[in-house]
Amino acid sequence: MSELLATYILADPGCDAEKRAEQIAIGLTVGSWTDLPLLKQEQLKKHKGRVVNVEETESELGEKQATVTIAYPEANFTNDIPAVLTTVFGKLSLDGKIKLADLEFSRSFKQSLPGPKFGVYGIRKKIGEFERPLLMSIFKGVIGRDMEDLKEQLRQQALGGVDLIKDDEILFETGSAPFEKRITEGKKVLEEAFEETGRKTLYAVNLTGRTMELKAKARKAAELGADVLLLNVFAYGLDVLQSFAEDDDIPLPIMAHPAVSGALTSSPHYGFSHSLLLGKLNRYAGADFSLFPSPYGSVALPKRDALAIYDECTKEDVFKPTFAVPSAGIHPGMVPLLMKDFGIDHIINAGGGIHGHPNGAAGGGRAFRAVIDAVLEAEPVEEKAKRSPDLKLALEKWGRVEVSV
């Protein structure tokens, strides 16, 4: 019988963590057990949850807690993420200090999920870069700007050598810069930049609107030649992401933005672990990219949480790996540390670290590319800066984060 394993962290589980775990296992499956007649117990046995493990520990704050793993028969729910979450964490999420830390799916259940269409290798193949972290930049200050302003931003970022450019997640459908026009006009700008530089740049356009409208809009984006779709996954739901990944008429990579996820992950006592929501479930539902706060920037996660997301995005599984995108407050002086912690297969994502460069967005992009090259070539960053005026200016403005051995 196939089972799904759910691991929880119970803060202050009471005097008997084993008893609390058993209450959860029974309460979220057959409802009661000891009061049932033997015949009914036999009939319901295959639907009964079971406690796999209970480990009592202390939190980092010295609080008593228990890590509990419960097995749920997959016969109890349909093979979709909403059914799973409702089963293992529906009413339970309302029942005191309890956090869903992980889900372990059976191989048969995984076969019903799409995973990324392109994954790390597919994205690299589109860009033609395989031996370094990719570089992404973000539109900045876009509210109230017209199409000409956005086109110039796009052009300057592309000339700086970035591999991907994404819309701001708060750029919605506007009269001055409508969705379809951003795709068609942006495509022209990037083609012109390619002719000038010989470097391929992909543009992630923000897919927004009412849920019922999104599929038609995504299909139209594909027809118009869009490169990538940016989706605020947790404003819409993982099932919406999955529906795009499964649709053959939407043959585009999907970039999952973490907007709203903080309300679901940030508490130590409630909600989901960062790695489950932004790592595993994003990947399983079909995200080719997963953005999340880096451990170093302006909206930082603890390093263990950021690395756990990266691990869920990239570790061996039946699905293609998702490109991990640690973000927020990234500048060129952080790149050696980013590459030490996240290796080659991640995307360096910068906003102000590119647009705030003294030589503009193009200079910001060149500074990032220079420091990436320095790390790959094992050249001291200060030596590289002597031959890269843009990197020198960036280090003077933002400084450098030291890498401990």
UniProtKB/Swiss-Prot annotation:
One of its GO terms (biological process) is L-methionine salvage from methylthioadenosine. InterPro entries: Diketo-Methiopentyl-P_enolase (IPR017717), RuBisCO (IPR033966), RuBisCO_lsu_C (IPR000685), RuBisCO_lsu_C_sf (IPR036376), RuBisCO_lsu_fd_N (IPR017443), RuBisCO_lsu_N_sf (IPR036422). Keywords: Amino-acid biosynthesis, Isomerase, Magnesium, Metal-binding, Methionine biosynthesis. It is an enzyme of class 5 (isomerase). Binds 1 Mg(2+) ion per subunit. The modification N6-carboxylysine is found at residue 166. The keyword Amino-acid biosynthesis applies. Mg(2+) binds at residues 166, 168-169. Signal peptide: none annotated. One of its GO terms (molecular function) is 2,3-diketo-5-methylthiopentyl-1-phosphate enolase activity. The keyword Lipid metabolism does not apply. Catalyzes the enolization of 2,3-diketo-5-methylthiopentyl-1-phosphate (DK-MTP-1-P) into 2-hydroxy-3-keto-5-methylthiopentenyl-1-phosphate (HK-MTPenyl-1-P). Belongs to the RuBisCO large chain family. Type IV subfamily. Homodimer. This is 2,3-diketo-5-methylthiopentyl-1-phosphate enolase. It comes from Bacillus licheniformis (strain ATCC 14580 / DSM 13 / JCM 2505 / CCUG 7422 / NBRC 12200 / NCIMB 9375 / NCTC 10341 / NRRL NRS-1264 / Gibson 46).
